[in-house]
Amino acid sequence: MGLPVSWAPPALWVLGCCALLLSLWALCTACRRPEDAVAPRKRARRQRARLQGSATAAEASLLRRTHLCSLSKSDTRLHELHRGPRSSRALRPASMDLLRPHWLEVSRDITGPQAAPSAFPHQELPRALPAAAATAGCAGLEATYSNVGLAALPGVSLAASPVVAEYARVQKRKGTHRSPQEPQQGKTEVTPAAQVDVLYSRVCKPKRRDPGPTTDPLDPKGQGAILALAGDLAYQTLPLRALDVDSGPLENVYESIRELGDPAGRSSTCGAGTPPASSCPSLGRGWRPLPASLP
């Protein structure tokens, strides 16, 4: 006969499976306990990440809109400062009406330039200053922008404020010590300003003095003729009347030739007539006798 084989009843198999399931469940619960303690922190981080992602998406959508690029009322808080009563019709600042929805609708519907003022019903436009106020402000000589105020008005020209040319002419002041030519300069200063430029181009020569009816020792006849040198270049005798000069005798500035050429008294040997050049050495070879008659 063989060995007897023991067969376990099915109830034991069922109990073993239940024990295995319970052990697995216990193991899973033990592993989840530390995760439950860290769960609030993870949840807070996840919520922050979600909020940041939604904020960036909202900002990107706002930046894409061109009509919302400027500051809004919530940022400036002007609507709270200048609110006023509801029934009042007082004008509000133009910055409060930039983002109103009716302004956008009206600006889209109306494209003509004539209807542009109607798109800003509550905006204060700058007004031009009256003529009296502008002229009163520009009356001062030390006004910085006086000409700008006059040019802005159509009826007033820039000629209303005369401009003085400070550097147009040179003004001379009289000094304490006066030279002999200063009396003549005083006469020229009396002339009008239009001839100032002409005065500087001319040379003021002093007038010749009239000593009297004395005659020149070189010209005993007093005809007013000038002797010309008889050298290589032939000059003609020119009368003084043809040169627009006074007919009176010239001032004796230089010493006579006889005094320089005859210091020892040889002038007595040379007669007053027309001696030859060899008999009168004081005259030299370059002189010729005076003509008998002058035209």
UniProtKB/Swiss-Prot annotation:
Record text on subunit structure and interactions: When phosphorylated in response to BCR activation, interacts with LYN, PIK3R1, PLCG2, and GRB2. When phosphorylated in response to TCR stimulation and/or CD4 co-stimulation, interacts with LCK, CSK, FYN, PTPN11/SHP2, GRB2, PIK3R1 and GRAP2.
Localization in the cell: Cell membrane
Biological function: Involved in BCR (B-cell antigen receptor)-mediated signaling in B-cells and TCR (T-cell antigen receptor)-mediated T-cell signaling in T-cells. In absence of TCR signaling, may be involved in CD4-mediated inhibition of T-cell activation. Couples activation of these receptors and their associated kinases with distal intracellular events such as calcium mobilization or MAPK activation through the recruitment of PLCG2, GRB2, GRAP2, and other signaling molecules.
Gene Ontology biological process: adaptive immune response; B cell receptor signaling pathway; regulation of canonical NF-kappaB signal transduction; regulation of non-canonical NF-kappaB signal transduction; regulation of phosphatidylinositol 3-kinase/protein kinase B signal transduction; regulation of release of sequestered calcium ion into cytosol; regulation of transcription by RNA polymerase II; T cell receptor signaling pathway
Cytoplasmic side of membrane: 28-295
Covalent lipid sites (S-palmitoyl cysteine): 28, 31
Segments of this protein annotated with the region Disordered: 170-192, 204-223, 261-295
Statement: the UniProt record of this protein carries the keyword Membrane: yes
Effect ascribed to mutating residue 200 to F: Reduces binding to CSK
Residue numbers spanned by region Interaction with CSK: 167-170, 200-203
Consequence of substituting residue 145 to F: No change in binding to LCK, CSK or FYN
Membrane topology: Single-pass type III membrane protein
UniProt cross-references to InterPro entries, sorted A to Z: Lime1
UniProt-recorded name of the protein: Lck-interacting transmembrane adapter 1
